[in-house]
């Protein structure tokens, strides 16, 4: 478990160097799965950045994304960090990120930054993950800085420690590499993740890559989170891929809504008369996800009111680029849609002329018109008393 131990140590280094009261860069929360941090620019505005640690870290870098995609340098810097094959260590990546942002805003580098700088190229351990690899990046204690002499016994102890570290890495290679990231994920979820991973790998080999690395990894994380979710386990909603080879198109089935709503009564009638116990939605993601929102539309049944447009698109600022944030999870989006339907007094149409499903083309057209209208008039924000 040398890699995991090293990651925990590096996280502790970051939290110590950049606490929540640091004037330039702050670690807001940190775990072996995800780090959330804030960069404070010259205008004292906070820029939130998140790093998702992949299961095969440090052989693969973290997945980086930010809520502040309006600043071009952030997107470019995060893309470089996510796609790099060098300096995948979290300390080195944070060093690169802070350096890029300080240069962009013409700010002085934090005095703590050199302590997490990557080593000289010749010193980088090719194994990426041993305890030897990043020792030069750890902060130097004041007591150690004053010691200029190292005796032979100390050198022998260091050699023994290095040897132990190498042995630990061999042991770790025999373990399930997904164990840390897949805790709490159901067998069904693990099977889906395994199948999707194999398909993605084959698509790369065939040169038929879908989407982007960032979008694919974020969607895989969303699948894990969904299969851990109590809402999912309690049957509030279910989800599946429209096609098993396409990670970018999902079916979402909403099974439960507020029991005090007319929509709840309509869903009971739908199940009794038509043997359908859910509202079916299509979620389509593009290669810019999570920076761009998914395109969401109702597929069936036909719904009147509830902010559902004629083509099946949904009138929600959350689903537009202006209202979306890369920090939103897919589950939070699903639950917000359910609340919006109830708030808008959505009703299922049992009229025979509405038995056919909506179409993607009509939904896209109506949503485009919606965006143009709200771009001019803005969005209505209800008072807090209305929820």
UniProtKB/Swiss-Prot annotation:
Subcellular location: Cytoplasm; Nucleus
Cellular component GO terms, alphabetical: cytosol; neuronal cell body; nucleus
Keywords assigned by UniProt, alphabetized: ATP-binding, Cytoplasm, Nucleotide-binding, Nucleus, Transferase, Ubl conjugation pathway
Pathway annotation: Protein modification; protein ubiquitination
Residue ranges of the region described as Disordered: 117-164
Active site: 315 (glycyl thioester intermediate)
Example GO BP: locomotion
GO molecular-function terms, A-Z: ATP binding; ubiquitin conjugating enzyme activity
Biased composition (Basic and acidic residues): 120-131
Ranges of biased composition (kind: Acidic residues): 139-164
Catalysed transformations (reactions): S-ubiquitinyl-[E1 ubiquitin-activating enzyme]-L-cysteine + [E2 ubiquitin-conjugating enzyme]-L-cysteine = [E1 ubiquitin-activating enzyme]-L-cysteine + S-ubiquitinyl-[E2 ubiquitin-conjugating enzyme]-L-cysteine
Pfam family, one: UQ_con
Disruption phenotype: In males and hermaphrodites, late-onset paralysis of muscular functions required for locomotion and defecation. In addition, hermaphrodites show a progressive egg-laying defect, resulting in intrauterine hatching and premature death. Vulva protrusion is often observed with occasional rupture resulting in the projection of internal organs.
Tissue expression from the record: In the embryo, expressed in precursor neuron and muscle cells and in other cells such as hypodermal cells. After hatching of L1 larvae and in all subsequent stages, strongest expression in pharyngeal muscle and anal muscle cells. In L4 larvae and adolescent hermaphrodites, also expressed in the vulval muscles. Expression also detected in all four nerve cords and in neurons with weaker levels in all body wall muscles.
Domain UBC core residues, every copy: 214-380
Keyword Secreted in record: no
EC numbers on record: 2.3.2.23
Enzyme class: transferase
Superkingdom to which the source organism belongs: Eukaryota
Gene3D superfamilies to which the protein is assigned, alphabetical: Ubiquitin Conjugating Enzyme
Family: Belongs to the ubiquitin-conjugating enzyme family.
Its job: Catalyzes the covalent attachment of ubiquitin to other proteins (Potential). Required for the maintenance of neuromuscular function.
Protein name: Ubiquitin-conjugating enzyme E2 25
Gene coding for it: ubc-25
């Amino acid at each position: 478990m040398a890699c995991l131990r090293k990651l925990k140590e590096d996280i502790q280094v970051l939290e110590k160097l950049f606490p929540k009261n640091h004037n330039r860069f702050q670690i807001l929360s940190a775990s072996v799965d995800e780090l959330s941090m804030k960069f404070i620019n010259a205008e004292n505005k906070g820029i939130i950045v998140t790093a998702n640690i992949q299961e095969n870290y440090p052989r693969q870098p973290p997945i980086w994304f930010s809520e502040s995609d309006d600043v071009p340098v952030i997107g470019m810097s995060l893309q470089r960090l996510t796609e790099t094959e060098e300096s995948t260590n979290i300390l080195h990546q944070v060093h690169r990120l802070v350096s890029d942002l300080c240069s962009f805003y013409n700010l002085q580098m934090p005095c703590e930054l050199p302590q997490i700088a990557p080593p000289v190229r010749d010193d980088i351990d090719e194994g990426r993950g041993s305890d030897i690899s990043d020792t030069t990046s750890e902060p130097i204690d004041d007591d150690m800085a004053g010691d200029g002499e190292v005796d032979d016994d100390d050198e022998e102890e260091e050699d023994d420690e290095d040897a132990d570290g190498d042995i630990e890495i061999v042991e770790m290679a025999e373990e399930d590499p997904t164990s840390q990231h897949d805790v709490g994920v159901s067998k069904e979820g693990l099977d889906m993740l395994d199948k999707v991973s194999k398909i993605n790998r084959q698509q790369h080999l065939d040169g038929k890559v879908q989407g982007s690395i960032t979008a694919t990894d974020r969607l895989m994380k969303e699948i894990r989170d969904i299969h851990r979710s109590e809402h999912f386990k309690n049957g509030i909603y279910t989800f599946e891929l429209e096609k098993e080879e396409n990670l970018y198109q999902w079916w979402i089935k909403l099974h439960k809504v507020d029991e005090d709503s007319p929509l709840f009564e309509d869903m009971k009638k739908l199940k009794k008369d038509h043997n359908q116990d859910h509202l079916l939605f299509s979620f389509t993601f593009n290669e810019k996800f999570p920076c761009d929102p998914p395109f969401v539309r109702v597929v069936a049944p036909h719904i009147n009111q509830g902010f559902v447009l004629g083509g099946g698109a949904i009138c929600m600022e959350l689903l537009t680029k202006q209202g979306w944030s890369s920090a939103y999870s897919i589950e939070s989006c699903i639950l917000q849609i359910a609340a919006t339907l109830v708030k808008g007094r959505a009703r299922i149409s049992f009229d025979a002329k509405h038995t056919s499903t909506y179409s993607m083309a009509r939904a896209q057209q109506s949503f485009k018109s919606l965006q143009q209208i709200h771009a001019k008039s803005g969005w209505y924000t209800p008072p807090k008393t209305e929820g």
